[in-house]
UniProtKB/Swiss-Prot annotation:
The lineage of its organism: Archaea, Methanobacteriati, Thermoplasmatota, Thermoplasmata, Thermoplasmatales. One of its GO terms (biological process) is carbohydrate metabolic process. This is Bifunctional phosphoglucose/phosphomannose isomerase. GO terms for molecular function: carbohydrate derivative binding; glucose-6-phosphate isomerase activity; mannose-6-phosphate isomerase activity. Residues 22-152 form the SIS domain. Optimum pH is 7.6. D-fructose 6-phosphate binds at G41, S42, S80, S82, T85, R128, H218, K306. It comes from the Archaea. Belongs to the PGI/PMI family. InterPro entries: Glu6P/Mann6P_isomerase_C, SIS_dom, SIS_dom_sf, SIS_PGI/PMI_1. The active site is at E202 (proton acceptor), H218 (proton donor), K306 (proton acceptor).
Length: 310
């Protein structure tokens, strides 16, 4: 059951800590850029990392092909939980041909047989339920967070495991109005807003939309004021420590006549706040799936698509 996988998230963080990383020193001067390839639940790892790391350029590749700049100075990380993701395998093969330093995070499959530096993670999960296993090796390798920051994150996640009534109430409100979730983030939580969107898609089996401040003020502002059937959407916005973003959130609500459900990140460290928000969204979507009486782990349509195009 997905709930049990949710509750394993904090244990993933405690288990992985900073001892799980790729081989090599990865000193800043030894590479020019980082490319992280991954799709779906595996692809979120690169998106999360890209908002936490800025010492070198980070490119998230969710395609068959890699960017032209990839060369021998590129640290290329292929992330595929199954090890058989078509797009990621194609990208990894191209990276090898271009002489990049290629690494992999996977539970097995063809990716584990490519002969590259590989971190093997436990199997038997849905990729989206293995976000800790998929993300922490990258964070540990390039950022090396403090032990106490990871412990803080694990503790906050454990608290959510014990009490997720707030998340259940949000799910109930969404279901009661048969509303479409809209999730607004801002740096460094843009990828988390996208993660929420995909969790609503896969877990609760409903459409959802995500965007981020302040970019959304250059496009979403007009429809927020003038669109039809606005009452069919459920708007949520992550709070920000940036006063300019906070002001934008408040002014956007006032001039468009829209109310946002404010979601506040907890934790003193960035890694704690990011993983807290991820876990928060996981529970909202789990509860919505339960209320809708749908199996949150069912991905039969996705598997059918893969079979038909293979």
């Amino acid at each position: 059951m997905l709930r049990s996988h949710c509750m394993e998230f904090s244990e993933e963080l405690k288990t992985l800590k900073d001892q799980v990383r790729f081989d090599g020193s990865f000193r800043t001067g030894t590479f020019s850029n980082i490319v992280i390839a991954g799709m779906g639940g595996s692809g979120i790892a690169g998106r999360i990392f890209s908002e936490m790391y800025s010492a070198k350029p980070v490119f998230v590749c969710d395609d068959y092909h890699i960017p032209e700049f990839v060369d021998g100075n590129t640290e290329f990380i292929a992330v595929s939980y199954s090890g058989n993701t078509e797009e990621t395998l194609s990208a990894a093969e191209e990276a090898i041909k271009k002489g990049a330093k290629v690494h992999a995070i996977t539970s097995g499959g063809r990716l584990s047989e490519m002969g590259v530096d590989t971190i093997k993670i436990p199997g038997g999960l849905q990729p989206r339920s293995a976000v800790g296993y998929l993300t922490m090796p990258i964070i540990n390798t390039f950022i090396r967070p403090k032990h106490e920051d990871i412990e803080e994150a694990a503790g906050l996640l454990s608290d959510l495991d014990k009490n997720n009534t707030v998340q259940e109430n949000i799910a109930t409100e969404i279901y009661a109005g048969r509303r479409i979730p809209v999730i607004y983030g801002s740096t460094p939580y843009r990828s988390v807003a996208y993660r929420w969107k995909t969790q609503f898609n896969e877990n609760a089996k409903i459409l959802a939309y995500s965007n981020y401040f302040s970019e959304l003020n250059h496009n979403d502002t007009m429809p927020l004021r003038d669109t039809y059937r606005k009452d069919e959407f459920y708007f949520m916005a992550f709070d920000s420590t940036d006063e300019r973003i906070r002001k934008r959130i408040e002014v956007t609500q006032k001039i468009t006549g829209t109310s946002f459900k404010k979601i506040e990140a907890r934790g003193s460290s960035l890694i704690a706040r990011i993983f807290y928000l991820i876990h928060f969204g996981d529970y909202v979507t789990y509860h919505l799936a339960r209320i809708r009486n749908v199996d949150p782990q069912d991905v039969s349509a996705i598997e059918d698509l893969k079979k038909r195009i293979s």
